[in-house]
Amino acid sequence: MKRKSFSFIALILSCTLLFVLQFAVQPVYAAEIPYIQKILDRGTLKVGLPPYTTPPFYYNDLKTGQLEGYDVEIARDFAAELGVEAVFDRDSASFNDLVRRAGAGDFDIAIGKLGTTYKRMSDAHPHEYMNFRHAILSNRKSIAAIQGNIPDDEFAAVLLESKMRIGFIANSAYDTFAQRYFPNAKRIGFKNWTECKKALFDGKVDGIYRDATEIKKIVYQTPSLSLDYVPILFEDVIDQKSIYTSTNAEVQIGSVLDYFISREVKVQSDSQIMESFYDYYRPNI
């Protein structure tokens, strides 16, 4: 009886040992790419986001206070594909500063309707995920004075060479674009988009300059403005919106980000965005 008990106990111990050894030799998942392993060890994807509010791209929900938006969800989805959560840094001083900090490695990626310029590409590496037409919202009287009898199909070139007063957000891509495309204009940078719009409505500038989604949003939400102001879209001048990475991140996860964009996001135009987020562009009632 004792021998049987001993044999039974030995069998249990043997099975237990085999069970333990089975799990002990199971490989622990580790990424071969060091940068991805660093993200996994940290448990989060660090994401830089502009210090502004720009629905439907990034904003705090009025009811919950939670950070929401198209760009926010892209960042969260990318983080989820890597097996971590996204954490957001909104402490940059401006759009340009955000890109600079991305290049310096303050976060893994920077997103937030960030335009692509040569200056920014000297700071960080861009990955295009949207492309929007350039646009201006201008006072009708100012435009009429510049156009005169010039046919509409010839007016764009004349407008770009004009001496109009044009407003934009300082230290943004449109600060750079204004210098390039409006060399003769009086260019005035403002702290934010609200101040830009106020300057236009107060008559301090003849037009304000940004991408089509922001210009068309103004007249879509308040149709009565079209009596005095006219949106002008430049069909052949495109603002390529990019997600930015540092050189270190680019070398190790740039291809992963491109794969994610091509499969899960796909490059969106301003028309596609406005159709997808109709609620943000419909008239205020």
Regions found by a protein language model. Give the residues of each.
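A ligand-binding cleft/hinge motif common to bilobed small-molecule-binding domains
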Residues: 96-97, 113-122, 177-180, 194, ...
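A conserved helix-loop-strand patch within extracytoplasmic ligand-binding domains
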Residues: 33, 84, 92-94, 114-119, ...
